[in-house]
Regions:
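A positional/structural detector of protein chain ends, strongest at the extreme C-terminus
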Residues: 1-4, 461-463
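Motif-centric detector for short Cys/His coordination patterns
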Residues: 2-197
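Active-site environment of non-heme Fe oxygenases that use a 2-His-1-carboxylate facial triad
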Residues: 174-216, 221-463
Length: 463
C-alpha cells in the first residue's frame, strides 16, 4: 500500500564540511602553522568572533544528524517517523540520483541517461511502499523532464549499504601490506612464471595480490623481445606515458640525459617524483645482462619507517618527514618539471600491515617519496626547518642503506621485476661496459589503473 507524501529534514549546507577528510600530515601542518602564527601576534588579535562558535555548533549538529541517518539506513530503513510523519533520511536529490534502473542508467555503458544538473531543486518523494522483503518503490513529485510517472526501486541491501559507510565499498576489504627486509622478503612467493601470469585470470590475480602486499614481484621465463614488457604491463593496466615514451631502454649511452642511462652507480630512488602524479608501478624487463656488476637492489621504505618508529628519536624524525616538503625537479633536454612533496604521505583511511613491529604507527601510511638524485638543486623558500629535515633524512637514509634493508639480485635475461614506485626504492650497482652487455626495457602503470585491475580480480584473491 502506497504511503503518503513524505518530508525531508534538510541538513544545513555547512554539513558538507564535516565530510572533508584531511591526512594526519595536513592536520599537523595546519596546527603547527596556526601555533606559530599565534606566537607571532598579540593574544588579543587571535580572539575569534562569535560566528565561529555558531559554525562549530552547526557542524556538530549536522554530524549528529548524518550519523543518525546512517544508523537508520544500516538497518535497511529509508524512512523514519518524524514530527510531521514519515521522513526520508536521504535528501531527495541524492535519492533520485541513486536510481539505477535502465531508464536512468544505460545497461550497456553504465552511464547516466540524464544530467544530474537537470534534477529540479524542488524534487520530492511523492509516495513510497515497502514489500515483505524490505525493498522500496518510490514515486516522485517534480521529477526530471521526461520522467513523469517514473518509479524508482531500491533493494534492502542497497539501502543498508548506504548506511555502512560514507562511501559504499564495491569490493572486499584490501589485504594487509606485508612489510619486509633482507631476511623476511618472501622471494619464492613473489616469483611467478610469465605464462602463469598472462595465461589466466587466476594467475594474474596471484601476481596482483602479491604485488599489492609486498610491492615487489619477479616474473620469469619471459620472451626476450622488445615488445614483451608492453604486453606484461597491459595485464596491470594501460601504460603510463611520460616524456620517455610508453616504454624506454635502460642501457649505457654516450652523453646520457639520465644517470640511469650510464654505467655509474645509481643509489636508491623513485622515478618521476617531479611529475604531478608519478607512476605508482614500474616494470624493468631484462633483455641482456652479461656485464660484470649491474646488480639491482630494492628496499621497502615502509619497513624502514617501522624501524624508525622503534625509538623516540626515530618517531621525531618520522614526524619531520611527514611535515617538511622536499623539492624535486628535472630540467634537461628541453624538459622542465618541478614538484614539492613531503617524504612521507599519510591517508585518512587506515590500512593494516603485517610483519610490522609498530603497526599502529603505520596504520595510515600511504606513500613515500624518496629520490635524492632528482632533487631540485636551487634554494627554495619551501625548505622550512632545513636542519631538522636534513637530520631526519640522514636518519632515514642510514636505515634505508643498511645491509639489513636491502634485497639484491642480478636480473637475468627473460626476468622482469615489477615494483611499487611509491613504496619500494630501487638502485643499481655500477657495471663494466667492456665486459658484456646490459639492456633493460622499462614501463610504468598508474596507481589508479592498477587499483582498477586489483578490484576486478579481488574475488579471485585470498580473503
Amino acid at each position: 500500500m502506497a504511503q503518503p507524501r513524505t518530508s525531508f529534514t534538510k541538513l544545513p549546507s555547512i554539513a558538507l564540511r564535516s565530510f572533508v577528510l584531511r591526512s594526519p600530515a595536513q592536520t599537523c601542518t595546519r596546527t603547527r602553522l596556526l601555533s606559530h602564527s599565534a606566537q607571532a601576534r598579540p593574544a588579543a588579535r587571535v580572539v575569534r568572533p562569535p560566528k565561529y562558535a555558531v559554525r562549530q555548533e552547526r557542524l556538530v549538529s549536522a554530524s549528529s544528524t548524518a550519523a543518525a541517518s546512517r544508523r537508520t539506513l544500516s538497518q535497511g530503513s529509508l524512512f523514519s517517523e518524524g514530527p510531521s510523519g514519515s521522513e526520508c533520511v536521504i535528501h531527495p536529490i541524492l535519492l533520485r540520483k541513486a536510481c539505477t534502473c535502465p531508464h536512468c542508467i544505460n545497461p550497456s555503458d553504465k552511464q547516466f541517461n540524464y544530467s544530474s544538473a537537470d534534477i529540479p531543486l524542488d524534487i520530492a518523494v511523492d509516495t513510497w511502499k515497502q514489500d515483505a522483503a524490505g525493498n522500496y518503490s518510490v514515486t516522485w513529485k517534480n521529477d526530471l523532464p521526461g520522467y513523469q510517472d517514473h518509479v524508482s526501486t531500491f533493494s534492502a541491501d542497497q539501502v543498508r549499504s548506504w548506511g555502512a559507510a560514507e562511501v559504499p565499498k564495491r569490493v572486499s576489504p584490501s589485504p594487509p601490506k606485508f612489510l619486509w627486509d633482507k631476511d623476511s622478503f618472501p622471494l619464492d612467493a613473489s616469483t611467478f612464471p610469465y605464462h602463469d601470469f598472462v595465461g589466466s585470470a587466476q594467475g594474474r590475480a596471484k601476481v596482483v595480490y602479491q604485488l599489492w602486499r609486498t610491492g615487489l614481484v619477479f616474473i620469469t621465463h619471459m620472451p626476450t623481445d622488445e615488445k614483451a614488457v608492453e604486453h606484461l604491463a597491459a595485464q596491470l593496466g594501460p601504460l603510463y606515458n611520460s616524456f620517455y615514451g610508453l616504454t624506454w631502454d635502460v642501457r649505457s649511452v654516450p652523453g646520457a640525459k639520465n644517470v640511469a642511462y650510464t654505467h655509474r652507480f645509481l643509489g636508491f630512488h623513485m622515478d618521476l617524483l617531479y611529475m604531478h602524479e608519478p607512476p605508482q608501478y614500474q616494470l624493468l624487463h631484462c633483455l641482456e645482462n652479461t656485464c660484470t656488476g649491474g646488480e639491482s637492489q630494492f628496499a621497502d621504505t615502509f619497513k624502514v619507517l617501522d624501524r624508525m618508529a622503534a625509538s623516540p628519536e626515530g618517531q621525531r624524525h618520522l614526524q619531520t618527514l611527514q611535515l617538511t616538503p622536499q623539492r624535486y625537479g628535472y630540467f634537461n633536454d628541453g624538459h622542465h618539471y618541478t614538484r614539492n612533496r613531503a617524504t612521507v604521505s599519510s591517508s585518512p583511511f587506515p590500512q593494516p600491515c603485517e610483519n610490522a613491529d609498530h603497526p599502529a604507527a603505520l596504520s595510515h601510511l600511504d606513500r613515500v617519496y624518496w629520490s635524492p638524485p632528482f632533487e631540485y638543486p636551487a634554494p627554495s623558500d619551501l625548505e622550512q626547518d632545513i636542519e631538522a629535515n636534513t637530520a631526519a633524512r640522514h636518519f632515514f637514509s642510514h636505515l634505508l642503506n643498511s645491509d639489513q634493508a636491502i634485497v639484491e639480485t642480478k636480473l637475468t635475461a627473460g626476468t622482469c621485476t615489477i615494483f611499487n614506485n611509491l613504496r619500494v626504492v630501487h638502485a643499481r650497482r655500477a657495471f663494466d661496459v667492456n665486459s658484456g652487455k646490459r639492456w633493460l626495457k622499462g614501463a610504468y602503470v598508474a596507481g589508479q589503473d592498477f587499483n582498477s585491475t586489483f578490484a576486478s580480480l579481488r574475488d579471485l584473491m585470498p580473503s
